[in-house]
Amino acid sequence: VEDEQDFEKLLADLHERFPNMGYLVQNANGTSIVEFYLPEDAKLPEDISQRWPIEELGYDNQQWLDDLRGKFKGVNVAGTRILPPWEEHCEDDLLIYPGMAFGTGEHASTQLALVLLSILPLQGKSLLDVGTGSGILAIYAKKRGCSKVTGVDIDPISVENALDNAKLNDVDISFEVADAYELKGEYDVVSANLVTDLLLGLREVLQPLAREFLVLSGIPFEDYDKIVESFGEPYLAVFGEDWIAFLYRRT
């Protein structure tokens, strides 16, 4: 994918249609190569396969994980090293095993959400992570001092992956399979790294859930006005690689 906006649309579209998708991005000579991994029974929609040149390869789970082992080396975000467990690490690092779930820390939307969480007073707070994927945001919040953290995802594979990652980091987090539209209760902080249309559809759910702070990410910059029109002007917005994340503060 040579056009940056096309790349963003492709990734957002794939993530929306296949929420348990694992992926890696490689950049070479101005071209982004997106490797995405789908379950064996998943069928790629024709509108995607016709728009971009796509090569399909068959992997069993072990081949896929072996392939990731050679490609995912980790990243440094908001002062925290995010690493796979096979890399040399220390207690302060956040460990993520790249399973079939979104969130290794390499994508800008995840990084922007982490940046916003890093500036919040999380010590002793409760946090709900909606669409938790690999659990990366929830685990980060727990390691930063949140007293109670809950992560929810509609996809059971993602929840399994998140539970595995919580064990890797020796943190106690409640991960549950749940429909975001049915969420109730109140949490000091709510994070949601989703796609724009889903965030817009969940506005009436997300806002009452957040007692103090609401973090929204997964938003291409071109959707800035859509989010502001629905949620209002943010307390803070951060940008990176043509993506944007919003922080709302309840007063």
Locate each region found by the language model.
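N-terminal auxiliary segments of SAM/dcSAM-dependent transferases
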Residues: 1-89
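A structural motif
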Residues: 19-20, 146, 210-211
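Conserved beta-strand segments of alpha/beta enzyme cores
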Residues: 22, 53-55, 81, 126, ...
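Active-site regions of enzymes building and remodeling cell-envelope glycoconjugates
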Residues: 50-59, 92-96, 230-238
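SAM-dependent Rossmann-like transferase core, predominantly class I methyltransferases
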Residues: 62-122
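Structural motif
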Residues: 92, 126, 188-189
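Conserved SAM/SAH cofactor-binding pocket of Class I
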Residues: 100, 104-182
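S-adenosylmethionine
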Residues: 115, 154-250
